[in-house]
Amino acid sequence: MVPRTLLNLIDKNEYLKIVSDLYISNGFEFYLVGGAVRDGILDIDTKDFDFTTNATPEDSISLLNSNGYKTTEIGREFGTIELQIDDNSVHITTYRKDTYENTSRNPSIESAADLNTDLSRRDFTINSIAYSIKENELVDPFLGLKDLASGTVSYTHLRAHETNV
C-alpha cells in the first residue's frame, strides 16, 4: 500500500502526474525514485524530484521538447536530463548500471535493461524504492520500506560505503 503522505506529495505537485502520463502514454516506463520517495513516505516536503526510465536521453529530449517542455542535458555521461516546468525542475535518468574497479571510486556507467538493475546501484535501501505514479505502486526490491519503518540505514550493495571516502 502506498502511504497517504507520498500521495499527498504527488497531489501537491500535479505536474509530476502530467510528465508521468506523457512517458507512459508513449510506451516508456517511468518511476519516481530516491529521496523524493523516501521523503514523501516520511511526510517530509521536497522539491527534489528524480525519475528513472527506460527512455534514452535522446528519447526524453525529443518527447519533452515536442510537447513544449524545455530540457537541458546536465549529465550526458550519467544519462541525465533536466526538465523545467515553470519554476520547477525534474531530473530524468535512463536506467543504468554502475560498476567499480577494485581500487576506483568512479563508476563505469552503462545502460541497464530494467528498473531493478537501476535501483541496485543506489547507495541505501531507503533510496532504492521506486514509485509508479500511473500504477500507484511502490517497487521495493531491497526492503527499503522495512528499513524506513525500523529507522535502519542499510547499504544496497557492498561498495556503497566506499564511494564517500
Predicted regions mapped to residue ranges:
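Catalytic cores of the polymerase beta-like nucleotidyltransferase superfamily
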Residues: 1-162
